[in-house]
């Protein structure tokens, strides 16, 4: 059961499969939490943990917050095993009870989204964002918006209730994990918990591995080849799920989808004229996630 598996990992009685996609190449290994937490001894603050459903599948994850500026490890239960995903400290801030969080790579490069799991990797499914190039642009679901709308969305996000953080102690682990899981166990079959949508997302994991291969010491030509390959892959993935949505929908719902998709494609074409290809690729990936949610009737942001 997840409660026992998470407890054993948090108390260093069991290894988990750890992925650090920030390293190059991607680092993956079976480890004890103490092997990673041992790197955090210089921090002034104590580690904490929270329990929250990060991806909306009704099965909570456990988020282990390392010390100051040390980042996070998101622990996920799948098929009887625990998987751990390393997230840098600016990649998961302001975590809310609905799984929303913010990321930042600079004062004017900020996004708010939720987490998607693709195989043994994770990604942030961005709801809205600000992107600084020569000027700052703002986006909602991949469509450009104005600064006023962005600020309204940000205010709404900040008003969401924060997750409850607990000090990382043995007594707290044993007290609070059952609190989150026992009530759910009667309603959900945890042993091999999955959904058709999750299986579909997992089938796209190779595309995400390719994206992360750009985190390295490459020549300009190598970077361009990686980015183009990534764009081509996500563009094909988007086209595939769009066709599935077309086949599923009928009547006015199908008409609305087709109009929205054409509008989105026109916007992407215009944006690509003066936007780096990796940003256009990110937009395409986010549109793919939106279409996946539509096809599987997943209300990810409701």
State where each predicted segment sits.
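Beta-propeller blade repeat segments, especially FG-GAP/WD-type strand-to-loop junctions
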Residues: 71-85, 115-118
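Short, surface-exposed coil-to-beta transition loops
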Residues: 59, 69-72, 86-88, 105-113, ...
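Acidic/hydrophobic-patterned starts of short beta strands in beta-sheet-rich repeat architectures
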Residues: 55-65, 98-102
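N-terminal alpha-helical modules
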Residues: 180-181, 186-302
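Core segments of small alpha/beta cavity-forming domains
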Residues: 16, 20-22, 45, 52, ...
């Amino acid at each position: 059961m997840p409660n026992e598996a998470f407890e054993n990992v948090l108390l260093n009685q069991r290894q988990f499969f750890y992925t650090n996609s920030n390293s190059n190449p991607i680092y993956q290994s079976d480890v004890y939490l103490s092997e990673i937490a041992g790197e955090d001894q210089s921090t002034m603050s104590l580690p904490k943990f929270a329990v929250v459903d990060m991806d909306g599948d009704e099965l909570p994850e456990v988020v282990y917050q390392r010390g100051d500026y040390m980042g996070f490890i998101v622990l996920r239960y799948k098929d009887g095993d625990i998987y751990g995903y390393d997230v840098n400290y600016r990649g998961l801030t302001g975590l809310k009870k609905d799984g929303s969080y913010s990321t930042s790579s600079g004062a004017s490069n900020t996004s708010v989204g939720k987490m998607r799991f693709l195989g043994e990797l994770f990604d942030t499914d961005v709801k809205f964002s600000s992107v600084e190039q020569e000027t700052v642009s703002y986006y909602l679901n991949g469509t450009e918006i104005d600064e006023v709308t962005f600020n309204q969305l940000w205010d709404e996000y900040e008003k969401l209730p924060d997750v409850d953080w607990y000090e990382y102690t043995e007594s707290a682990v044993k007290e609070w994990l059952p609190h989150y899981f026992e009530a759910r166990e009667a309603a959900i079959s945890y042993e091999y918990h999955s959904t058709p949508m999750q299986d579909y997302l997992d089938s796209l994991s190779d595309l995400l591995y390719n994206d992360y291969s750009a985190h390295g010491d490459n020549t300009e030509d190598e970077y361009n080849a990686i980015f183009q390959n990534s764009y081509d892959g996500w563009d094909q993935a988007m086209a595939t799920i769009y066709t599935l949505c077309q086949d599923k929908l009928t009547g006015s719902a199908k008409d609305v989808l087709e109009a929205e998709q054409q509008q989105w494609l026109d916007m992407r074409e215009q944006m690509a004229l003066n936007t780096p290809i990796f940003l256009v690729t990110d937009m395409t990936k986010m549109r793919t996630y939106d279409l996946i949610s539509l096809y599987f009737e997943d209300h990810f942001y409701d």
